[in-house]
């Protein structure tokens, strides 16, 4: 059974771990990939060993993101999922199920989150998981670099599906 945790606990857990695997959902969209990559970059900035794993190939439209794809070069001591409301959303490929059944922490914005992780931070009022990370990353002591900002912007922009007029006006 999952335990709902606050932001301070999330920051504490992430700072206490060294070898961190970040899981994204199958058929990855801008929020799961943008959030996962932003968190990975922030953790690496803090000296952590971190990488991202997704069951499905990452679409070419996200090639501009500096994604560190998990290659098995370290043994994850802590597993965090971003933007994944239920265990069935992980998919089957890339041995992801090996890690999906042992998620330490889930950071999500879906009120329908099934509570599969040991600890969960869900803010159903957030537009995207990326929105949560815009404040969690500085709370961890990491700087929001242009690369991290781009990933977070992608997560917020593509998940909320703005109209062409919204993009033009901004």
Tell where the protein language model's regions lie, with residue ranges:
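Fold-independent oxyanion-binding glycine-rich loops
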Residues: 25-26, 55-56, 82-85, 107-110, ...
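Predominant activation on well-ordered alpha-helical scaffold segments within soluble catalytic domains
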Residues: 11, 37-40, 59, 130-135, ...
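Single conserved hydrophobic/aromatic residue that forms the stacking wall/gate
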Residues: 162-170
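Positively charged, low-complexity intrinsically disordered leader regions
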Residues: 1-17
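Active-site cofactor/cluster-binding pocket
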Residues: 63-119
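Short alpha-helices
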Residues: 110-161
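Divalent metal-coordination and catalytic microenvironments
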Residues: 29, 39, 80, 133, ...
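Anionic-ligand anchoring segments at beta-strand to alpha-helix junctions in alpha/beta enzyme folds, i.e.
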Residues: 21-74
């Amino acid at each position: 059974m999952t335990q709902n945790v606050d932001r301070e606990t999330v920051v504490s857990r992430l700072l206490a771990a060294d070898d961190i695997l970040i899981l994204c959902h199958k058929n990855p969209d801008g929020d799961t990939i943008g959030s996962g990559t932003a968190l990975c970059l922030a953790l690496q900035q803090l000296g952590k060993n971190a990488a991202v794993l997704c069951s499905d190939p990452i679409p070419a439209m996200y090639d501009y993101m500096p994604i560190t794809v998990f290659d098995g070069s370290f043994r994850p001591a802590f597993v965090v999922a971003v933007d994944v409301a239920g265990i069935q959303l992980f998919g089957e490929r890339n041995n992801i199920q090996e890690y999906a059944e042992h998620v330490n922490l889930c950071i999500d914005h879906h009120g329908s989150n099934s509570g599969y992780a040991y600890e969960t931070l869900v803010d159903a009022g957030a537009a995207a998981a990326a929105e949560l990370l815009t404040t969690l990353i500085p709370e961890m002591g990491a700087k929001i670099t242009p690369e991290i900002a781009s990933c977070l912007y992608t997560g917020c922009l593509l998940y909320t599906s703005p109209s062409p007029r919204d993009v033009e006006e901004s």
